[in-house]
């Protein structure tokens, strides 16, 4: 809306970022919390990477639109956390955490197809993180290829792990929704957004790594 010159868009963005800074972003942790009640009096102890993934996406857009580089820096801080967790877990990204950011790898094991907090790894998110990391590193490091290289390699690791685990994993075409921590499919559904992200990320990584 801001780039399109829509009336009120700049003010709406300013208000949204101010609220996010106040209620959701934790500067000390370098991560975002997940859920408040509507009165902003009770913060849910659950912490999750789905919210932080979309926060990275929003921060990159905010940096581009406003010119305020603090949002790009914040996106990088989130990414650095995610890469530590992913590397420690064979590049399968933990999704669910306690309030002090300890991964809960057993979350919803008894309800693996929970709509908002499914059990296990979500390969589509690994693919999406790979694209976001690449987008961030290109806009941050620009011509500094040596500085960018470890992040590009990490993005490839996330992408390759997700595809190896989930592509045609159960004999059916497409990318399964979730796997366990050994890469075995759990929820076999095929989501439209997963394939869309895979096509997007494939194109991005191909352009960057060729």
Cite the ranges covered by each PLM segment.
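Glycan-recognition and catalytic cores of secretory/periplasmic carbohydrate-active enzymes
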Residues: 1-210
